[in-house]
Amino acid sequence: SGEIPLLEQLGATVYRGKAGQKFVFQMNDAEKAATRALQDRNLTVAMAQEADLLVLDEAGSAWELDMVDKDLLHRAVLRRPAGQECVLTAHAAPQWMLDAADYVTEMKCIRHPYQKGIAARKGVEY
């Protein structure tokens, strides 16, 4: 999330898809539904914008965890306007998504202070 202010300074429109501060496994059903509704709404709005670049951060996880309408995400990736490139940060993304994106990055955690119970710190994790 630390990249968001810079992207906004550069004129990018950033749609954030989290309705709270919890991880999905910590959410109750109502929180999951609210987050999914927000994800779907943001993706619908993003798809309606004219843009050269569509960045789908953690879209594979959203797909796997059923936190986004799968048909909507499928359309966003496979039926995007001609000339629009798709950037995907992929953790657990389905193969079709990996094949369709123009750029795919997977960050693999080998060690992180979170594993020792250290909370996210301003200026480091966000």
Positions of the model-derived regions?
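Conserved P-loop
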Residues: 1-47
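Short, well-ordered alpha-helix to beta-strand connector turns
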Residues: 11, 50-51, 101
